[in-house]
Regions:
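Extended, compositionally simple hydrophobic/Ser/Thr-rich segments
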Residues: 42-54, 103-105, 110-243
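A generic structural signal for beta-strand entry/edge sites
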Residues: 61, 80-82
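Short carbohydrate-recognition loop motifs
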Residues: 82-88
Length: 243
């Protein structure tokens, strides 16, 4: 067994590229926070196992927090209004699971998140925009968002990454085709349009009108006493009033 374990370690180290060697054989180092260059952006594309903390602000700014020896493997770039955050770290399994990279993003006009990573996203205050959109594809972390917008779209296409939203909205569009859950009970809204084609559950409490469609194993729980715009129940899941 010891020989097998040693072989796995050796293969992992061999797989590390030259510019990732420190990632595989060195410690994270002391915690450090560094500023990164920033310019205005409207979309954030987040990959890898990186936690992001969002703050609505009048200026755009980015700081990266983590072990000094690993910060060079974290990429933050902005082009054509898109902020891209990724990591080249490959040997996280040899370190303490709590030693995670955190990126603090101050944003003035963020209105779209494209999420393909496994880190978590949180907000220190409300992100205020006319519209806001989340597109999750193979994401596996949790997005805890505080959004104030007229219209919000939460689209979870694949993967188990959940959305838990607070704030306010006039209209919400909820969609899932994966394993994820969507909980918008804390986001006050008037209309809720729900398409659950996945196996996770939705929770929504529109004050005016509810539209619900279930096509798979996931349930839709709706609360309050909204007008029912339409109901479709074609999966093994159900549309449920309350719990």
């Amino acid at each position: 067994m010891k020989q097998f374990t040693a072989l796995l370690v050796l293969l992992a180290l061999i797989s590390c590229a030259d510019d990732q060697w420190d990632d595989c054989v060195t410690s994270t180092g002391p915690n450090l926070t560094v500023e990164r260059e920033a310019s205005p952006f409207h979309t954030m594309e987040l990959g890898s196992k990186i936690d992001v903390v969002l703050t609505q602000d009048s200026v755009d700014a980015i700081t990266v927090e983590g072990g000094r020896n690993l910060l060079g493997q974290v990429e933050t770039s902005i082009s054509d209004g898109v902020l891209r955050i990724n990591s080249n770290l490959t040997c996280n399994w040899v370190r303490n699971l709590h030693d995670r990279i955190k990126v603090h993003v101050h944003c003035s006009s963020l209105r779209t998140i494209v999420y393909t990573g496994s880190g978590d996203v949180t907000c220190t205050n409300a992100i205020v925009q006319p519209t806001f959109r989340v597109e999750q594809r193979q994401g596996s972390g949790t997005l805890r968002l505080n959004i104030e917008a007229d219209t919000c779209w939460y689209g979870l296409h694949t993967g188990p990454g959940n959305v838990i939203a607070s704030g306010t909205a006039n209209v919400l569009y909820l969609y899932s085709n994966g394993y994820a859950h969507i909980d918008v009970l804390a986001q006050q809204h008037q209309q809720s349009h729900c398409n659950n084609s996945g196996s996770g559950d939705f929770r929504t409490a529109p004050s005016a009108v509810f539209y619900g469609a279930v096509y798979n194993a996931g349930d839709i729980h709706y609360y309050g006493d909204p007008i029912i715009g339409s109901l479709v129940d074609e999966g093994s899941g159900s549309v449920i009033h309350g719990d």
